[in-house]
Amino acid sequence: MAFAISAMMSCEIETSGNGDLDGFWHLVRVDTLSTGGMCDMSGRRVFWSVQVGILNATDYDRYHKGYLFHFDKTDSSLHIFDPYKDNRTEGDIKIEDPSELYHLGINAIDETFTIEQLEGSRMILATDVLRLSFKKM
């Protein structure tokens, strides 16, 4: 009995501090800022999943395992970096060519997004080139 009580007292609930960012996000729209172009992504299966310090970006129509990133978040920015292609059976593969990430709305190996909106079920991220709109699932 004493062991059970001491074990329970030593447990702490871990929180990420990510707030509304944590969760499963569907990329529903990509705007190209320089041209004013818009791409409706709502019919595509591109998702970003965020938990603690890992972001997993997956295009289920192309490659179902996804890409893993570390990230840093402030109130106004999301910095993603150090991408790896998920390959658990043989070891994750470090991404060196950013073109491998374009279909996910990511244009660089190390990229910082301005958080234009992050509340409830809506997130909008922007760079100098793109604006990404997400819906939380």
Which residues are covered by each model-predicted region?
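N-terminal helix-cap/turn-to-beta initiation motif at the start of protein domains
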Residues: 11-26
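Sec-dependent bacterial lipoprotein signal peptides
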Residues: 1-12
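Long, contiguous N-terminal structural blocks used for assembly/anchoring
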Residues: 28-31, 47
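Contiguous, well-ordered beta-strand patches that form the walls/edges
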Residues: 31-38, 42, 53-118
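Short beta-strand segments
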Residues: 46, 67, 111, 130-133
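Edge beta-strand at a domain terminus
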Residues: 70-76, 118-137
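Short, surface-exposed polybasic-and-hydrophobic patches located at secondary-structure transitions
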Residues: 40-52, 135-137
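Short, hydrophobic/aromatic-rich segments at coil-to-beta transitions
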Residues: 22-24, 51-56, 118-124
